[in-house]
């Protein structure tokens, strides 16, 4: 049994120093929301909160081993994990009410049986079967619409009142059955393994974002103008609401307001491998694997969409069923030990590896056919009313006309394939100068990966420069091609073979007879990909693929996990107190230095008209170009002051000043290099009782010990923007805004990982 509880401090709340949110203004906004709710007969008691984020879990397992006889051994294991994690706390640029914080809950039950059999002197068999039941859910506070107001203060701060919009109805049930059998044949200097690995999945996915309604105001002025009109009963009050979202299940179709998308699939695999000991020093391993995905269900048919897609030359249908195509994975590897004394070992291999797509991506096509769900997305419409009763969103007047029937469609290529990579590695282990060395190179090339298109939008044939006169920015412009049709967004899941990564590493280790162990390593990595695909939603995965050219054909960019430089080192010293071997003391220091997280800079707003807000990479203008850019004044930030501040900020920010007149490429720069030291000390006391040795070990670990010595050491940095996508410039209504001083900050110490942490341990072995 294992129990774990962790708390992560949340440093930013109402009135916290350094926050970008105007505290007095935020309080007035919340009071106005409560007043409007009360006038509508709904009691709302939300307060701004910044509790520490907690993560806790309970784990239990039981294992039974049975030696049936000399030839058969049976093992049965059951394990249970109950885990919870709090999410949705505020940050330096956001202030949230307590009901915006949600809890992620996960319960997993696993039972597995394994039978090992020796069939003959040259044949053995391993049979495994398991069942895994996973129940995941997200819960938030008392149901209430999501209300977001931007620019609460002069530094682009925002407040979130009410539930987090993705957590209003969110749960996933998974049942996975696995069967595996491996038969091994020992034939001379060959070890041949033949086997099968099969998995059967059943999914039930509840996901209805914006179920209680989501309202977005661009600034406090719009919000308070709406509030005054609300109190006065003024017609047309809805024009101040910049965006309204609502989604609900079509109960006449689904029979259930909290409808779940359900589907099943399987992956069947067969393989054969031969490990050939050519000599005492040379070993060759080669084999072939075949995986066959099977899909048991088909999404619902949306006849109007299918007709439109066929007329426009698209090969998509909502009721496409994925093809079951065999995926072949040949592999070969070798290991050569020069003298069979481990003084020089050369090893390597090359092969194709097949993964599986997170099935939640496929579930989007079952949830979003346009049949089971209705989505409403309305911009600045005078029929929008801020309804604060979460159960009365369907009464909103605009649902009867302006957006009734708007559908978000998710489709996939009929020939869509699971992920496949070609991987190769070459390593050398050798001894020189009394040191153990390891040098290794690893290369990976994408064969099949994912990316998304929104085919409801297409290029107009004009560029941003053509339309605005800002000739230096020639990114294509987009327009909706489904106007007059109910299909507001159509996200297509596709395959791409673009992407690669490689790493080069060197490691040195040395152990001394007097108890000192030293190790150091350096790794250089470069990784490029087409689509981050970090979300469970097709819309987010498309929108989070930042680009400076083509939204539906994104360019290759640095991966979100690209950390070019990594240095590791450790020193451990073990000794016996007063030469008494019953008392062993261990003292150690571990160092890790690495490049900071990669980040991108993009515009807040929709620059190219593709309906993606926050996916347009920023053009880094020269001073001459800034003089030609139109700006919108706000508060104390006049147009001229914004131009001056932007010029000064670009001139002193390291990466930006060197790339004026260029686009900021995806993840092209990294936050500052990070240095972390950990300290470890342990005392082990041993005593022999009869033939049994009993040992008690007491340990102390201080993680990020540098921060204990100096508060400015051991910093870990983030941008405080989602996915490290920084938006210093806003573009809306044909004008830009830079609402900051020349000291606009892009890096902030992360409160938890920048602190030192201590851990005491006690271990008893016998």
Which positions does each model-derived feature cover?
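Transmembrane beta-barrel strands of outer-membrane/channel proteins
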Residues: 1-3, 76-80, 127-133, 194-200, ...
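Hydrophobic, lipid-facing positions within transmembrane beta-strands of outer-membrane proteins
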Residues: 58-62, 107-113, 129, 175-181, ...
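Short loop/turn motifs that connect adjacent beta-strands in outer-membrane beta-barrel proteins
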Residues: 71, 121-122, 185-191, 281, ...
């Amino acid at each position: 049994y294992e129990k774990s509880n962790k708390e992560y401090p949340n440093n930013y709340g109402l009135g916290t120093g350094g926050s970008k949110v105007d505290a007095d203004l935020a309080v007035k906004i919340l009071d106005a929301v409560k007043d409007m709710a009360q006038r509508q007969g709904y009691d709302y008691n939300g307060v701004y909160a910044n509790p520490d984020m907690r993560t806790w879990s309970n784990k239990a397992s039981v294992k039974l081993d049975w030696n049936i006889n000399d030839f058969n051994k049976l093992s049965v294991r059951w394990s249970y994990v109950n885990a919870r994690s709090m999410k949705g706390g505020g940050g330096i640029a956001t202030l949230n009410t307590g009901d915006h914080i949600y809890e992620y809950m996960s319960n997993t039950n696993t039972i597995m049986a394994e039978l090992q059999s020796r069939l003959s002197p040259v044949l053995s068999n391993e049979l495994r079967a398991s069942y895994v039941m996973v129940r995941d859910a997200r819960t938030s506070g008392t149901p209430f619409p999501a209300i977001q107001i931007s620019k609460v203060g002069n530094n682009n701060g925002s407040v979130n009142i009410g539930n987090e919009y993705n957590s209003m109805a969110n749960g996933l049930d998974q049942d996975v059955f696995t069967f595996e059998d491996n038969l091994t044949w020992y034939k001379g200097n060959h070890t041949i393994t033949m086997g099968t690995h099969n998995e059967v999945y059943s999914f039930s996915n509840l996901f209805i974002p914006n179920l209680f309604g989501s309202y977005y105001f661009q600034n406090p002025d719009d919000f308070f103008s709406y509030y005054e009109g609300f109190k006065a009963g003024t017609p047309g009050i809805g024009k101040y609401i910049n965006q309204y979202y609502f989604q609900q299940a079509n109960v006449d179709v689904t029979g259930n307001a909290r409808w779940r998308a359900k589907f099943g699939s399987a992956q069947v695999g067969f393989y054969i491998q031969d490990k050939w000991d050519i000599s005492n020093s040379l070993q060759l391993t080669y084999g072939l694997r075949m995986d066959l995905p099977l899909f048991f269900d088909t999404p619902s048919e949306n006849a109007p969409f299918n007709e439109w897609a066929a007329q426009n030359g698209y090969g998509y249908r909502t009721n496409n069923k994925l093809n079951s195509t065999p995926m072949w994975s040949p592999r070969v590897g070798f290991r050569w030990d020069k003298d069979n004394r481990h003084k020089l070992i050369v090893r390597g291999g090359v092969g194709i590896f097949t993964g599986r797509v997170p099935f939640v991506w496929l579930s989007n096509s079952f949830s979003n056919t346009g049949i089971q769900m209705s989505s409403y997305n309305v911009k600045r419409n005078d029929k929008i009313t801020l309804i604060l009763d979460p159960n009365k969103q369907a009464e909103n007047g605009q649902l009867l006309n302006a957006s009734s029937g708007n559908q978000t469609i998710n489709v996939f290529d009929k020939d869509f394939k699971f992920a496949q990579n070609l991987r190769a590695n070459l390593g050398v282990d050798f001894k020189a100068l009394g040191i153990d060395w390891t040098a290794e190179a690893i290369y990976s090339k994408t064969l099949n990966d994912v990316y998304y298109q929104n085919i409801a939008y297409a290029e107009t044939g004009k560029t941003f420069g053509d339309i605005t006169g800002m000739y230096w920015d020639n990114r294509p412009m987009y327009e909706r091609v489904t106007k007059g049709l109910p299909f507001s967004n159509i996200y297509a899941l596709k395959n791409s073979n673009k992407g690669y990564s490689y790493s080069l590493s060197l490691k040195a280790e040395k152990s001394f007879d007097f108890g000192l162990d030293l190790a150091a390593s350096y790794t250089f990595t470069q990784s490029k990909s087409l689509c981050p695909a970090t979300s469970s939603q097709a819309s987010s995965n498309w929108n989070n693929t930042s680009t400076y050219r083509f939204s539906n054909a994104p360019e290759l960019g640095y991966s979100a996990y690209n950390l070019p430089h990594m240095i590791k080192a450790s020193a451990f010293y073990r000794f016996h107190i007063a030469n008494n071997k019953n008392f062993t003391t261990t003292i150690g220091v571990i160092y890790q230095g690495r490049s900071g997280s990669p980040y991108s800079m993009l515009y807040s707003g929709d620059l190219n008209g593709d309906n993606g807000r926050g996916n347009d990479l920023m053009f880094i203008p020269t001073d001459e170009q800034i003089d030609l850019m139109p700006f919108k004044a706000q508060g104390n930030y006049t147009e001229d002051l914004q131009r001056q501040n932007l010029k000064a900020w670009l001139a002193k920010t390291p990466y930006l000043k060197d790339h004026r007149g260029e686009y900021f490429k995806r993840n092209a720069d990294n936050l500052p290099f990070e240095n972390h030291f950990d300290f470890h000390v342990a005392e082990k006391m041993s005593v022999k009782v009869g033939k049994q040795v009993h040992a008690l070990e007491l340990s102390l670990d201080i993680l990020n010990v540098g921060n204990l010595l100096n508060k400015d050491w051991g910093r870990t940095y983030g941008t405080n923007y989602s996915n490290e996508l920084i938006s210093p410039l806003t573009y809306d209504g044909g004008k830009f805004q830079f609402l900051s001083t020349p000291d606009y900050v892009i890096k902030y110490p992360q409160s938890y990982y920048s602190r030192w942490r201590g851990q005491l341990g006690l271990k008893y072995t016998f």
